């Protein structure tokens, strides 16, 4: 209640209920208490959910594969990489960071000691050949999808690529075939480079996998459309710069309109034939 300076103590006592507080803007009273109350009431399970900490044990060795190319930001790691490193450290495990070009040597030096390898999605094809089958392997993007509660939907969405691939095989050489429409969405508005994963690499991999020439639409930031009718598939980035509410809103929008939606890492893992392996750690450690 505001304007507490205008009411007496009896009025306050009669009108006070659970989780209520009296505030006076005039006298600056109760404002800090109000902020603390709002903070307590808005606690969500996101604050207790873990990116990777529930999948590893103290003392585990976790290798993080982070390619450094022209699309990587200068002088820093992107947010999911920072968050995974922090979560590994909070668990009491050890994070070893390397580029994909040094992964083979890193694994050789750590032979028999690595519990998990987390890779940037675009390096999946190379990394999968180097990581022993008895070592868990996943990606930052897949970890982010699980963290935001969207992994199940992302896995289902990735399998739409198989349907498109089948259509590509059936219509090979038939120019009358209708090109599928795919929306590729970025949560942030970074400056795109010549080898950008969302606008260059991912479309190229999809063309190669499906044998089709899909009609791609690219959006970023707040450009995500309200109406998704006409799209065969939505492929979203990991959404590290979007809060959980916004990501759920976008996922819900797709579900309400019966448009399958996946994310970069899940789609790339599926096209490389290692999606099942990328999910193995979740199926073994927790129920997704």
Annotate each PLM feature:
Residues 1-54, 63, 92, 98-99, ...:
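Canonical P-loop GTPase G-domain recognition
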Residues 56, 60-288:
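P-loop NTP-binding site
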